[in-house]
Structure formats: structure tokens, C-alpha cells
Design a protein with these regions (language model features):
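Acidic beta-strand-to-loop metal/phosphate-binding motif
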Residues: 63-68
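Long, low-complexity, Lys/Arg-enriched
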Residues: 1-62, 74-132
Length: 132
């Protein structure tokens, strides 16, 4: 097991994967590289309406791996709301070399795929807005 640098120096045994998408083999292999081969991944395939949904789903997990909009990510990483580490996958958008028809436009365009490029810990998200 790897100890992640957190306020509590948590030994990571279980990771919540909160995403509508199944974790890829590359993502899982990389998590095992980071946290150890014995890591348990708890998948929740849902859409969150609030950061509280993620906290509830991950109440028994040590790390929260998420795919969330910026405002919800800001709430989840706020130390008043959550003390657990929050991580997210990094992906590269790579051309496949094939052309496909975009159903929205009817035009032919280059096809892309996403390749896992690592994990990052989200320390803080700041959302600054201005009403128009």
C-alpha cells in the first residue's frame, strides 16, 4: 500500500471511481502502480447532483476518483466539505487515423480516441464567475 500525502497521511486501500464510464484497464493498472496491487476500486456509475452524492458513495473509501463538472469539483475539494484526497484521470485526445460522419453536422471529420495519460490529485478548484 502507498501512503498518499494528505493532511492525515492516509494509507490507501480503497478508491471510489465515480463516473458514468467504466474504468479502463490502463487507468486501473496505473492506480495499482500508485497505490499498490491490493487496491480495491469501488465503481459508482451515476450522475451526481451535488458533491454530497460523491461523499455518500465514497464514505467507506480512502480516495475519491471522480469525473465531475468544475463547480462540483470545487465543492468536493473544499476542506470544509471533504478531507479525503480527490483525484482525476488525465487523458490525451489521439487521432485514430479514421474518418467518421459527425451525426450532429452530417460532415465527415477525423475520429479521435482518449488514451490514459496518468492521474492527478485535485488540490483546489477556484470558480470565478460574473453575472451577465
Amino acid at each position: 500500500m502507498t501512503t498518499m500525502n494528505t493532511n492525515a497521511n492516509v494509507t490507501v486501500k480503497s478508491v471510489l471511481w465515480f463516473s458514468r464510464h467504466t474504468m479502463t484497464d490502463d487507468q486501473l493498472s496505473d492506480l495499482k502502480r500508485i497505490f499498490g496491487e491490493d487496491i480495491i476500486v469501488h465503481q459508482v456509475s451515476a450522475s451526481a447532483t451535488s458533491f454530497r452524492d460523491v461523499l455518500e458513495a465514497g464514505k467507506d473509501d480512502d480516495v475519491l476518483a471522480v469525473v465531475l463538472p468544475p463547480a462540483m469539483l470545487a465543492d468536493l475539494t473544499n476542506p470544509r466539505n471533504n478531507q479525503k484526497p480527490v483525484i482525476r484521470a488525465i487523458a490525451n485526445r489521439v487521432p485514430t487515423g479514421q474518418m467518421v460522419v459527425n451525426p450532429a453536422t452530417g460532415r465527415e471529420e477525423e475520429q479521435f480516441k482518449f488514451e490514459h495519460a496518468g492521474w492527478e490529485r485535485v488540490i483546489k478548484i477556484e470558480v470565478v464567475t460574473e453575472k451577465l
